């Protein structure tokens, strides 16, 4: 009887270990943004834009990206990436921006939405020809006097083109922020977690 009890206890211990074992960890690869631009849409006069029309501004080589909601202007950052693995392997993606140009005095919510196309170029993209976007699929709350956290971009990653290209829009739910761009030497970084 004692031998049977030991075998039963050993078998239960093995089953318990198997049942509580952690799944294998995900692999991670990180890549910088390939392109970025502020997309400026406003009905006011913009002296630095062709014909004074804000929709015609090309801002793809500025050192910063701006997002603004409210007032007479609507600005969002458009950022393009390429997945380092096939989209079907992706479990999670985050995008990390380096820092705000100036820390925010008040909290702000940052939104991420998928651009419907990755067919744009920093030299020519404007408010008139920028790709359409979907509704925001993630929102991150940023407390006052802190930098942006890693932003969830999983939905856009999983919908990437066959070659891995995809773009996201980063915006402000209410308010305005400015972050460093690829042209400043501080590109956004895509962190891809995959199996």
Swiss-Prot record:
Region annotation Disordered: where it falls in the sequence: 119-141
Subcellular location(s) of the protein: Secreted
Keywords in alphabetical order: Glycoprotein, Secreted, Signal
Residue positions the entry lists as glycosylated: 62, 109
The UniProt record lists the keyword Signal: yes
Record-level GO cellular component terms: extracellular region
Signal peptide residues on this chain, from the entry's feature table: 1-21
Name of protein: Uncharacterized secreted protein ARB_00595
Species whose genome carries this gene: Arthroderma benhamiae (strain ATCC MYA-4681 / CBS 112371)
Taxon lineage: Eukaryota, Fungi, Dikarya, Ascomycota, Pezizomycotina
């Amino acid at each position: 009887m004692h031998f049977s009890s030991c075998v039963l206890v050993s078998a239960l211990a093995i089953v318990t270990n198997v049942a509580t074992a952690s799944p294998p960890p995900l692999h991670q690869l990180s890549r910088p943004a390939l392109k970025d631009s502020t997309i400026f849409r406003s009905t006011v006069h913009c002296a630095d834009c062709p014909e004074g029309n804000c929709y015609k501004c090309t801002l793809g080589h500025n050192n910063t990206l701006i997002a603004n909601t409210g007032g007479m202007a609507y600005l969002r950052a458009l950022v393009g990436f390429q997945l380092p693995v096939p989209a079907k392997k992706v479990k999670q993606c985050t995008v990390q921006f380096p820092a705000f140009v100036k820390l925010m005095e008040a909290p702000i919510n940052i939104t991420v939405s998928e651009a419907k196309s990755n067919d744009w170029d920093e030299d020519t993209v404007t408010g008139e020809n920028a790709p359409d976007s979907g509704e925001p699929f993630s929102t991150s709350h940023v407390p006052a006097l802190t930098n942006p956290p890693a932003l969830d971009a999983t939905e856009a990653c999983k919908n990437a083109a066959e070659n891995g290209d995809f773009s996201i829009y980063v915006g402000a739910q209410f308010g305005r922020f400015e972050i460093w761009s690829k042209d400043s030497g501080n590109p956004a970084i895509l962190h891809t977690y995959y199996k």
